[in-house]
Amino acid sequence: MPFVELETNLPAERLPPGLPLKLCEATATILGKPAERVNVTVRSGMPMVLAGSAEPCAQLLVSSIGVVGSAQQNQGHSARFFDFLTTELGLGPERIVIRFYPLEPWQIGKNRTVMTFL
């Protein structure tokens, strides 16, 4: 069950239409998870500074069980997420940062229990 949070200082009107759904589909493909299990949040117009500059930028937080737990996995994921974000947001790769967080099944609650028991 991946969780993806995109934060950017770009105003909402500069984001492409349907970005949350596109990011959901891209995440499913990149991480090899069904889109029905992907959770996406997009926050625009955030006050942000990246590398000492308030120029347009974005950060992506990717949390998931079993697919973001190694440098080798995340190197491949990073390249594919960067391709998606630079295309969709019109930002250079130097204005984007990605953080990966591996999760354990007991850390995600769903249907009145945790994923460990589902």
From Swiss-Prot:
GO terms for cellular component: cytoplasm; extracellular space. Its EC number is 4.1.1.84. It catalyses: D-dopachrome + H(+) = 5,6-dihydroxyindole + CO2. Its main location: cytoplasm. It is found in: Cytoplasm. One of its GO terms (molecular function) is D-dopachrome decarboxylase activity. Belongs to the MIF family. Homotrimer. This is D-dopachrome decarboxylase. It comes from Gallus gallus.
